[in-house]
């Protein structure tokens, strides 16, 4: 038997029952400075083995007596935890889990036991499961892993298999994010390649972008350190395209169009790439909204130094870049892929293989999926703590 301690700072999210709950209470140290009874803190973990578990709540700061409602909706569990100065480790009783899967535990402060004048709700550090026979029976984001990437959730990829990889100069992909699956932080990347990526993002409640970036050949996360001979150079851009440099995930040239794309619409992305005679390779991205135009719009064209390449390593991905929304599921469809070589000969896209990032590979998060829908094309899904699917890394999907 062993005890499993699940840290709030790596595995919890907050939601609000009122229109205005602006404070963020979740830090790596736990849930801190929590005053609002309209805020619900939700902690997630995955159980691989059914069984009975004792649970307790660990705090390392209690300012005054307070009461927190603890509920597990899927188990019809409800408990009122009353804290005083002696309640740094408070037993919540036992739970019985009959089926493997994700468990969500909600915490909400009661209005009657807290007053802004007298201090905060108790600081929540960890939820402890006791009587665990096998440590590997409980999966969650470990403190040894990045809380940023763990709370973001797993990124998932489709790696396209073409009948030929030689001299691919043009690639087209259609991407649709279904209605209600477009949470803030979503990046449905339509066309990735060895030197950059191109797709659409939800950047906030009020802004969405069509983003195209190309990496510099100099390996650095600091764009200001790139030597002049390693700079990615802008060749041309669309009328309303914004141009920046980027860092923290490699560095290079960034271009984006602020655009109010809509969930449920299939948008068209086209990428051209070829080696120039000047030692650069040229990469140009175009976007088309089928609801508004029959023509593609130029996003930007970049040239990359010390590179002689057509389009290689073609893939798509779905990620969440906002750690505060990793508890919300995303989904995207990728359809009608077309490839052409430098002689404009069509190259068949035969299939797509599934892969994921370290968050999934190290089993910090299990909420990922991918496959094929013969009507809507290949799909990717991630985040939201849905129960694990049977898809595995390396699975190959083919459309009829």
What do the predicted segments below correspond to?
Residues 1-260, 268-275, 279-400:
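Extracytoplasmic
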